[in-house]
């Protein structure tokens, strides 16, 4: 298994680990999203001083406004964070 295939598998497993806790097992509720962010992206969450960060992320991700985040909506968050991390990495390499 390549590194990229392994990363994709990890994304899928992480999503379903959290999405299967309550309600629709293929979507993240607000509580499941918060749990995922705290468990998997705690450094990112801690860096934000905004107490409404989870609500804002949920609102931004929930494109169809159903109050839940499906896998496709979740991957948008991961992609955006990855782009931001890459930009930071490139800047740090320049210095």
From Swiss-Prot:
Name the residues that bind Ca(2+) 2.
62, 64, 66, 68, 73
Q: Which UniProt keywords apply?
A: Calcium, Cytoplasm, Metal-binding, Mitochondrion, Repeat, Sarcoplasmic reticulum, Zinc
Show where the EF-hand domain sits. 12-47, 49-84
Q: Give any Gene Ontology cellular component.
A: mitochondrion
Q: Where in the cell is it found?
A: Cytoplasm; Sarcoplasmic reticulum; Mitochondrion
Matching SMART domains, A to Z? EFh, S_100
Instruction: Using the record for this protein, list the coiled-coil segments as residue ranges, or answer none.
Output: none
The entry's comment on post-translational modification says:
Glutathionylated; glutathionylation increases affinity to calcium about 10-fold.
Which residues take part in binding Ca(2+) 1? 27, 32
The UniProt GO MF terms for this protein read: calcium ion binding; calcium-dependent protein binding
Record's subunit section: Dimer of either two alpha chains, or two beta chains, or one alpha and one beta chain. Also forms heterodimers with S100P. Interacts with AGER. Interacts with CAPZA1. Interacts with FKBP4. Interacts with RYR1 and RYR2. Interacts with CACYBP in a calcium-dependent manner. Interacts with PPP5C (via TPR repeats); the interaction is calcium-dependent and modulates PPP5C activity. Interacts with ATP2A2 and PLN in a Ca(2+)-dependent manner. Interacts with mitochondrial F1-ATPase subunits ATP5F1A and ATP5F1B; these interactions increase F1-ATPase activity.
Instruction: Briefly state the protein's biological role.
Output: Small calcium binding protein that plays important roles in several biological processes such as Ca(2+) homeostasis, chondrocyte biology and cardiomyocyte regulation. In response to an increase in intracellular Ca(2+) levels, binds calcium which triggers conformational changes. These changes allow interactions with specific target proteins and modulate their activity.
Q: Which PANTHER family match?
A: PROTEIN S100, S100 CALCIUM-BINDING PROTEIN
Q: Write the protein's name.
A: Protein S100-A1
List the taxonomic lineage.
Eukaryota, Metazoa, Chordata, Craniata, Vertebrata
